[in-house]
Amino acid sequence: MSCANLKTLEEGANHPDRGRQFRYLNNQVRRFLRAGAPAISVDTKKKELIGRYYNPGRRWRPQGKPEKVRVHDFIDPEEPKAVPYGVYDVARNQGWVNVGRDHDTASFAVESIRRWWSALGCEEYPEARQLLICADSGGSNGYRLRLWKVELQALADDTGLGVTVGHLPPGTSKWNKIEHRLFSYISMNWRGRCQTDRSHHDQDRIKSQSPIGQAQVSLEGQSDGRSDAFA
């Protein structure tokens, strides 16, 4: 006998249509890219506490001057959380983040997409008539949420775009392209640093510069490139 951690080796039943759904999503992305239409991957990153809370990781600091944090991570009700909602442009390998203050809702998710379109999308795709959104099956952009569908219809009415949504199969959100192309670089940028000022999050755009980013459209692909933040 020995002490051991729990190991998650099984993820439940493997539905026979899961692989077919991945292939369908991949073909949809390819079709939109060939037509010059925007295809984006969206999701909500882990909520971040604002204040001197411990954040795992290490970063370079002057010797003998570590950044001081609280002993206990008790949440301060007076300080809102940062809720980063990301939009990753598959064709241009660019990411954009909208940061909320309180709750991760369907209205917030669609508003983030609307702001991405107003800030970047309409300039990058002036002739676009269609928009493909790749998202996981749960959370604020879950396929069962009626508010998500209502807000998407409002987005389509406001922008004049035909909006197509492709949901990844349940339990496969780690294959969502934004996880590897955008959120992973944000996590590396934030590691070992307290998020003491919400202005560090506001309108935070991340550009992930990968040599394969322009061509790799598989939702299961990963990037080995680097990232630079731009204002």
Write out the residue ranges for each language-model feature.
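Well-ordered, non-membrane alpha-helical segments in soluble/globular domains
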Residues: F22, A109-W116, L145-L152
